[in-house]
């Protein structure tokens, strides 16, 4: 098994507390409203804290698919949220687990800087596929942008 680590950073004009609330605390209701492809987010195991498994149901290419997302850690005081993809379409056959360590920081003019460390654990001697990595980054960037756009369009939230 190999472990490969990647880091990424995004910026937004949305304040960290507001963004964190949408991405973590109210994710089950905000994400389906903000991200067109995601139809629902539901808890399948747990109480919403670490260890909880959520099922994100989405439409991709006209088909209904899902991703299983396990909450690893929540640090509300420091705007931290760690989770893993543990099942569904988010895991290619060569990947055992994909973990995300995310944190929001104060950015310029009251905005936010979002930092994420992604750890990919492969099965056996498999290497991560560069195209899969690029596609995953593009999905992550589009997700972040969709939440940002929703919050900008809904200042009352």
Curated annotation (Swiss-Prot):
Trans-zeatin 3 binds at residues 69, 81. It comes from the Eukaryota. It is found in: Cytoplasm, Cytosol. SUPFAM superfamilies: Bet v1-like. InterPro entries: Bet_v_I/MLP (IPR000916), Bet_v_I_allergen (IPR024949), Plant_def-hormone_signal (IPR050279), START-like_dom_sf (IPR023393). Signal peptide: none annotated. Belongs to the BetVI family. Class II ribonuclease (RNase). Binds to cytokinins. Interacts with melatonin. This is Class 10 plant pathogenesis-related protein 2E. It comes from Lupinus luteus (European yellow lupine).
């Amino acid at each position: 098994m190999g472990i490969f680590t990647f880091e990424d950073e995004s910026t937004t004009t949305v304040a960290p507390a507001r963004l964190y609330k949408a991405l973590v605390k109210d994710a089950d209701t905000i994400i389906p409203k903000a991200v067109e492809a995601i139809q629902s987010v539901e808890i399948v195991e747990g109480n919403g804290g670490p260890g909880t498994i959520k099922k994100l149901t989405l439409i991709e290419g006209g088909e209904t698919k899902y991703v299983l997302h396990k909450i690893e850690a929540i640090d509300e005081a420091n705007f931290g949220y760690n989770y893993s993809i543990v099942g569904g379409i988010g895991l290619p056959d060569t990947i055992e687990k994909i973990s995300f360590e995310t944190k929001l920081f104060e950015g310029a003019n009251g905005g936010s800087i979002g930092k994420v460390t992604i750890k990919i654990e492969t099965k056996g001697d498999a290497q991560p596929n560069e195209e899969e990595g690029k596609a995953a980054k593009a999905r992550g960037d589009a997700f972040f942008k969709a939440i940002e756009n929703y919050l900008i369009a809904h200042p009352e939230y």
